[in-house]
């Protein structure tokens, strides 16, 4: 490739990366959403249904995390997704699976524990990014 073509490719790559970054507005919105999810999820079925939304928020923020935070969260998530059983069978979709079926009491307990720990971890990370803003915006 000639120099001009290489320069254009590099510029496009750089611009694309900058445009797809996780902005402060998105972080604040996700911080408020995690707080709302945790505050309004009272029963087990609601918690289980909202696991997917928490995982979506994590997937959006994961590239912005420090490598040690990301590794810790990935280990945490993969550890739980293997334990959650749907109708007595391990979920095949991993972390992206939406838990729609009725769960046994033991699986429901694992899933709600996962919801609580995941929500608390996400809230902790998001709060560390905006320590003064999270409570004021509510």
From Swiss-Prot:
The keyword Secreted applies. It comes from the Eukaryota. Keywords: Immunity, Innate immunity, Secreted, Signal. The keyword RNA-binding does not apply. GO terms for cellular component: extracellular region; extracellular space. Residues 1-21 form the signal peptide. It is found in: Secreted. A humoral factor that may play a role in stress tolerance. Induction: By a variety of stressful conditions including bacterial infection, heat shock and exposure to ultraviolet light. GO terms for biological process: cellular response to heat; cellular response to UV; innate immune response; response to bacterium; response to heat; response to UV. Belongs to the Turandot family. This is Protein Turandot B.
């Amino acid at each position: 490739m000639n120099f001009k073509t290489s320069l254009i490719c590099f510029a496009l790559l750089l611009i694309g990366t900058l445009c797809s970054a996780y902005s402060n507005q998105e972080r604040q919105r996700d911080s408020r959403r995690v707080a709302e999810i945790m505050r309004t999820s009272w029963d087990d079925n609601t918690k289980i249904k909202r696991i997917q939304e928490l995982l979506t928020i994590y997937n959006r923020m994961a590239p912005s995390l420090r490598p040690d935070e990301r590794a810790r969260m990935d280990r945490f998530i993969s550890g739980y997704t293997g334990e959650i059983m749907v109708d007595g069978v391990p979920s095949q979709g991993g972390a992206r699976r939406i838990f729609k079926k009725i769960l046994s009491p033991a699986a429901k307990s694992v899933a709600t524990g996962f919801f609580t720990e995941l929500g608390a971890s996400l809230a902790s990370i998001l709060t560390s990014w905006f320590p003064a803003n999270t409570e004021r915006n509510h």
